[in-house]
Amino acid sequence: MSHEKAQKAQKLERDKEMERDNNGTGLIEKLLRTDDQSEDINKLCDIVRETSFQIHKFLRSGHLEKIYESALTHRLTKMGIPVIQQHELGVFDEDGTSLGRLCVDLFVANRLIVEVKACRAVVDEHIAQLLGYLRASRIEHGLLINFGGQRLQIKKYILN
């Protein structure tokens, strides 16, 4: 089997899995529940990654960050995955005092922060920004996605 046919077969299999798992429960519905979060967050990240690749293939590089952010929001929402664009999260001191608010690019399914970039390369400040968002919000999982280069860059970060 050629590499291209193998990729198409894998994509078809992923699409089928997204529609239904073995129990007949829709994957999207399953992702929205909080039972098995470790497996579900990985599936959610896979969906966001695959969707990002599709967007990058279609739009390529050269657009503003906002365009990629909107495209990702649109496509994930079409799949039934809740996404909040430019979501504000509170930052609190150890005694609970509000220190202010921060704004994440995308907050996906109430458990994944996605920081979108459209630059030549990811730099330490971009990573620090996402890690700061994760720490401040106490969300464990984040994706840093850069649409700005010739090749799409996606990096997952997990806070323990």
Task: Provide a role label for each language-model segment.
Residues G24-T25, I81-I84, A121-Q129:
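A cross-kingdom feature that marks ATP-driven nucleic-acid transaction machinery
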Residues V48-F58:
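A short, surface-exposed helix-loop junction/capping segment
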Residues M1-K43:
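Intrinsic disorder/low-complexity segments
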Residues R60, V83, V104-R120, Y133:
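Conserved catalytic cores of phosphodiester-cleaving nucleases, focusing on short active-site segments
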Residues R33, Q37, I41-D46, S61-E65, ...:
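Nuclease catalytic cores
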